[in-house]
Structure formats: structure tokens, C-alpha cells
Curated annotation (Swiss-Prot):
One of its GO terms (molecular function) is electron transfer activity. [4Fe-4S] cluster binds at residues 288, 291, 295, 496. InterPro entries: Ald_Fedxn_OxRdtase_dom2 (IPR013984), Ald_Fedxn_OxRdtase_dom3 (IPR013985), Ald_Fedxn_OxRdtase_N (IPR013983), Ald_Fedxn_OxRdtase_N_sf (IPR036503), OxRdtase_Ald_Fedxn_C (IPR001203), Tungsten_al_ferr_oxy-like_C (IPR036021), W-dependent_AOR (IPR051919). Disulfide bonds: none annotated. It comes from Pyrococcus abyssi (strain GE5 / Orsay). The keyword Ubl conjugation does not apply. PANTHER family: ALDEHYDE FERREDOXIN OXIDOREDUCTASE (PTHR30038), TUNGSTEN-CONTAINING ALDEHYDE FERREDOXIN OXIDOREDUCTASE (PTHR30038:SF0). Binds 1 [4Fe-4S] cluster per subunit. It comes from the Archaea. Belongs to the AOR/FOR family. SMART domains: AFOR_N (SM00790). It catalyses: an aldehyde + 2 oxidized [2Fe-2S]-[ferredoxin] + H2O = a carboxylate + 2 reduced [2Fe-2S]-[ferredoxin] + 3 H(+). This is Tungsten-containing aldehyde ferredoxin oxidoreductase.
Length: 607
């Protein structure tokens, strides 16, 4: 096979066994990689109703066939497991250099099972694999962990995926971190890693990924890179200002969620924009492996020195969503969230939930520990500087916040003020200003998520063409489905979503065929994406998903018209779109997958 080693590493932390397993090209053609591999093994080997923190839950690190190649952004990997935040599938994507290094070591994926009886880390040096004691780094921050483990193994070139104290303490939105600030962020994958007493995976590889026709592959790659460089977003806005270039754009379009989605316009947006960040704090760009875009930021603050980020989502989650406009405070908060290993979107969403519950009188000052604790008021930067540390350590009221926004709101009888889907906090786009995006939120397999359908592209940015954000026709619903399947394909290939700014489905076909030696059509590849999406949906249904209750949005977004800005008066007309979405997906009226659809997609073994 080209693009693959055909090798999976299986590690049982309970009994310490380490096994090499193989797969063939038929398997690769069906599941492609990353999310595809992950959902296959979860469905095949695990009861979807298992407790996410039990040893029976599996934690899978998987690459794609283009991971480790020179394909633009070909450094991605994913972490797949059952989420302790949602109770459903978690698949978190990260860039940096860890994914490529895992591929260079000769492995396509790692399946982690069981639970160690003490803190350990996994050391992979090509085909040599060891489970080592991690007691000396347990409790350390992410940067401290990376430094200590590089010194211990005597190799500064190893790549490390690790958890911080938030993962160790099973904060339900803990992330897996690599290269300091790259995060497999959402769904609590870091908490699952912590529940297994696995502190880190350290990898060093010396192999190179083989492609079917190197000359043809490089010709195709050069063409795709040129398209990306000519694109105004991939070749202009993102390299110049990072992902926070979206702050002003989304705010001007009136869907920049402010103060827990109470409105879509933030009066201080420019002060936390990518333009402002570049002018005040930027030192240099920092691209991930094989990336011609280079959206990563290295910033400098006197209080913490050099740091990376924040990205658009983090800037919003720790800024406008909390009514906070001080960019230095946002950068510092993002830094510590990374060091502790926390998903900034869920962190900000949880704090925003606490702020609204507090301001509405549902959370009292005595509930959070008395008069000496910083009050949860919108705009209070002290909340960032204080509660992030308490959450990561599960200290005081931080222990309650560490459960996430939904469980917090449920505890204080205010679930209508939790802005999330399937218990996962929503990201930085108010769907009252992009209704197709709202449908994507509601039907997303991992809960509140933007990057598994990113309808912001057509509805706001005009990719692949401009669509009216308030159109809810069949064409819009079909586009949501296409984007869901396409993003599953891009993930499975081992590429970054940002390549869609400049590339389309045919471009991914070209790269994959040249690398793998296949003769697949665009439709063949999109069918893989559809298979993955439906398999993840099936896992959720088996885990207990009630579609008609849970394929929904917060009441505010469905019933409270946007109070100001370009989308004033709009709500998300989800009830008018959802039945057509189910029908166009080939599902039943109550959102379940019929047997004939499963057979059509080759999923009959999971019926």
C-alpha cells in the first residue's frame, strides 16, 4: 500500500501488553483514516453505552494517508473516543508535528485500552514501543512535561502528545496537547487520557511515507499549493492575521456571539481582532507540518513571555462571549488554558454560562465560595485570571465548573442559559445570522461544533459560492450535508479544514489518487465521508441519542430574535429544516438510520 504502513499499535495499559496489528487496502478504501479508523474500532470493539471514564473506553490516535506527506497541511492527526462531556462520539483534530512523526515511526494509528495502575507514558521509537513510568511529570504543565520528557529520552527531536493537570483531574473538557499549543481540543479527549493514567505519548520516527507516483504527486501538490497561495483567505488573511482575522468579519456580519449569545455584535471587537493582535503582540508566524498557509501566531506578553495563539475561537470564547475586551488578558488566559490542557471553547462557554446564571440570580455569591471569590459578571477579567486555575485543579467552585456548562446550568436550574448542543458548548458563530450553520450545529455528531460542517464558508465567506444566510431551501440543506461529508473526508485524509479556502472536493480527489494509486471519483471519496458520518451517528444512537430531543439548539437561538445588527429580528428556523435534513440523509422521520441505508453504506456488520 502507498500512503499507509498498514500497521496499528494496540496498547493495553491494564496488563501492559503491546501488539502490532495490520490492515489491508480494502479496509483503507472503506475508512480512509483518522475518524474513519476511529469510529470503526469503537463500533466493532466497544459497547457505546460504556462509561467514558471506565477502562473499557478506548482512546484512539489516528493519522490519515496524507499525514506525513508533502500534501498541503499534511500533518494532521485525530483523537477518537467516547466523550465524557457529551456521552457520544468525540473526535478531536490537531496539527503541529506529532501526527507526521507518528507516521514516520511506521504507525497509522494507536489504540489505547485499559488503565494503568500508576502514571505512565508511551515511548515509541520506530518499531520499538515501551510503557514507561511518568510519576515525575504527573502534575506538570504541558510545557514542563514536554521539556522533561525530551530530556529523559535524550532526544530533542521527539514529538509529544500530552495532557496537563486538567486532563489528570478529568476536567470534562480537557484537551490533548502537542507542540506546546496545538490542541486536539474538543469533547474531553484529554480527560479520557487522564482517566487511563496516561500522561503522554512520545514519538520518534525515521521512515518516510511512500506515495504511488512521486513525480505525479509532486506535480499535483504544487498545483494545489499555488491555488491556496492565490486565495484571498488561505493566501492572504490567514497568513497575515491568523484565524482571528475572522473577528471583524463575523462581527460586521452580526453573528459574533456576545455575552453568552445575548447578541451578535460586540462593541469592542476590533480591540481583540487579528489586526489588533498583529499590531501589538505578534512576533512571527508558526506553521504546522507541510503547511503553506501558516496561520499560527507567536505573540509576546511581558507577563508570560512568548506564547502561541489565541486562535479566533479562543479569542472569542475568552473575550466577547464573556464581555471582556482586554486582549492582553485574553492572550494570557489562552496561554494558561493551553498549559493546563483545556479546550478554550468549552472553557469560555462554561464561564459565560456561569456569568449569566450569576447575573440572573441563579448562582449566588455564597455558592461560589463567599465574598472573597471573584464574581461572575460579564466583563470581569478577574474571572479569567482566577477561575481557570481553579477549574484545572478542581478546587472549590472550580470543581463544579470543571463539569462543563450544561451540568453547571442543570445544577442551578438554568439549562435554558446553556448555549450548547448535546452538552457541548457552542463555538463562535451565532446561527441566527447563518441558519444553515445552525442546522449543522443541531445535527453534529460531536455536539456543538463548527468545523465538522463549517457552513460559514458559503453563508458568510462565499466558498464555494455565496449563499443567503437566511435561505432555508433544500439547496441549503443539501449543502449542509455535503459539507458534513466533505469535512469527514478531509479529516480522514489527514488534512486541515483551512484548505477548503482555495480547494474543492476534486482537489482532494486528485491528491489522494496521486498518493495512493487509486482511481476513485470525487463521488467515491464523498461516499467515504458519508459512511463515516453515518457510522458516527450510529454510535451515538447506540449510546442513547434521542434525535428529536437532542438534534436541536438552545431556546434562545430558536425563539429569541437577534436584538440588533444585520440579523436583527432573525431566529433559526430549525423546525423547517430538520425534517428535510433527515429525509435527504435517507434517515427515518425520527432521525434514525434505516437498515437499508446502513447496508448501502457497507455498515451492515454494525446492525
Amino acid at each position: 500500500m502507498f500512503g499507509y504502513w498498514g500497521k496499528i499499535l494496540r496498547v493495553n495499559l491494564t496488563d501492559g501488553t503491546i501488539k502490532e496489528e495490520t490492515f489491508n487496502e480494502e479496509f483503507a478504501k472503506k475508512w480512509l483514516g483518522t475518524r474513519g479508523f476511529g469510529i470503526y474500532f469503537l463500533l466493532k470493539e466497544m459497547d457505546p453505552k460504556v462509561d467514558p471514564f471506565s477502562p473499557e473506553n478506548k482512546l484512539i490516535f489516528a493519522t490519515g494517508p496524507l499525514t506525513g506527506t508533502s500534501a498541503p497541511t499534511g500533518g494532521r492527526y485525530m483523537v477518537i473516543t467516547k466523550s465524557p462531556l457529551t456521552g457520544y462520539i468525540a473526535m478531536a483534530n490537531s496539527g503541529g508535528y506529532f501526527g507526521a512523526e507518528l507516521k514516520f515511526a511506521g504507525w497509522d494509528a494507536i489504540i489505547i485500552e485499559g488503565k494503568a495502575d500508576h502514571p505512565v507514558y508511551l515511548y515509541i521509537h520506530d518499531e520499538n514501543v515501551e510503557i514507561r513510568d511518568a510519576s515525575k511529570v504527573w502534575g506538570k504543565l504541558v510545557s514542563e512535561t514536554e521539556k522533561a520528557l525530551k530530556e529523559e529520552v535524550g532526544d530533542k527531536h521527539v514529538q509529544i502528545a500530552s495532557i496537563g493537570p486538567a486532563g489528570e483531574n478529568k476536567v470534562r473538557f480537557a484537551a490533548v496537547m502537542n507542540n506546546g499549543h496545538r490542541a486536539a481540543g474538543r469533547g474531553g479527549v484529554g480527560a479520557v487520557m487522564g482517566s487511563k493514567n496516561l500522561k503522554a505519548i512520545v514519538v520518534r520516527g525515521h521512515k518516510r511515507v511512500e506515495v504511488a507516483d512521486k513525480g505525479k504527486f509532486m506535480e499535483v501538490i504544487r498545483e494545489k499549493i499555488e491555488k491556496l497561495k492565490k486565495d484571498p483567505v488561505a493566501g492572504g488573511g490567514l497568513p497575515k492575521y491568523g484565524t482571528a482575522v475572522l473577528v471583524n468579519i463575523i462581527n460586521e456580519h452580526g453573528l459574533y456571539p456576545t455575552r453568552n449569545f445575548q447578541t451578535g455584535v460586540f462593541e469592542y471587537a476590533y480591540e481583540q481582532s487579528g489586526e489588533a493582535m498583529a499590531a501589538k503582540y505578534l512576533i512571527r508566524n508558526k506553521p504546522c507540518f507541510a503547511c503553506p498557509i501558516g496561520c499560527g501566531r507567536v505573540n509576546y506578553l511581558p507577563s508570560i513571555g512568548e506564547t502561541e495563539g489565541p486562535e479566533y475561537e479562543s479569542t472569542w470564547a475568552l473575550g466577547a462571549n464573556l464581555g471582556i475586551n482586554d486582549l492582553a488578558s485574553i492572550i494570557e488566559a489562552n496561554h494558561f488554558a493551553d498549559e493546563y490542557g483545556m479546550d478554550t471553547i468549552s472553557l469560555g462557554g462554561t464561564l459565560a454560562t456561569a456569568m449569566e446564571l450569576y447575573e440572573r440570580g441563579l448562582i449566588k455569591q455564597e455558592d461560589i465560595g463567599g465574598e472573597n471569590e471573584p464574581p461572575f459578571r460579564f466583563g470581569n477579567t478577574e474571572v479569567l485570571h482566577y477561575w481557570i486555575h481553579k477549574i484545572a485543579k478542581r478546587e472549590g467552585f472550580g470543581d463544579i465548573l470543571a463539569e462543563g456548562g450544561y451540568r453547571l446550568a442543570e445544577r442551578f436550574n438554568g439549562t435554558e442559559y446553556f448555549m450548547g448542543v448535546k452538552k457541548q458548548e457552542l463555538p463562535a458563530y451565532d446561527p441566527r445570522g447563518a441558519e444553515g450553520h445552525g442546522l449543522g450545529y443541531a445535527t453534529n455528531n460531536r455536539g456543538g461544533c463548527h468545523i465538522k460542517q463549517y457552513m460559514i464558508s458559503p453563508e458568510i465567506l462565499g466558498y464555494p459560492y455565496k449563499m443567503d444566510p437566511h435561505d432555508i431551501s433544500d439547496e441549503k440543506v443539501k449543502m449542509v450535508i455535503l459539507f458534513q461529508d466533505l469535512t469527514a473526508l478531509i479529516d480522514a485524509a489527514g488534512l486541515c479544514l483551512f484548505t477548503t479556502f482555495g480547494l474543492g472536493a476534486d482537489d482532494y480527489r486528485d491528491m489522494l489518487n496521486a498518493a495512493l494509486g487509486w482511481d476513485f471519483s470525487t463521488e467515491d471519496y464523498l461516499k467515504i465521508g458519508e459512511r463515516i458520518w453515518n457510522a458516527e451517528r450510529l454510535f451515538n444512537l447506540k449510546a442513547g441519542l434521542d434525535p428529536l430531543k437532542e438534534d436541536t439548539l438552545p431556546k434562545r437561538l430558536l425563539e429569541e430574535p437577534m436584538p440588533e445588527g444585520p440579523n436583527k429580528g432573525h431566529v433559526v428556523r430549525l423546525k423547517e429544516m430538520l425534517p428535510r435534513y433527515y429525509k435527504l440523509r435517507g434517515w427515518t422521520e425520527d432521525g434514525r438510520i434505516p437498515e437499508e441505508k446502513l447496508k448501502e453504506l457497507g455498515l451492515e456488520e454494525f446492525i
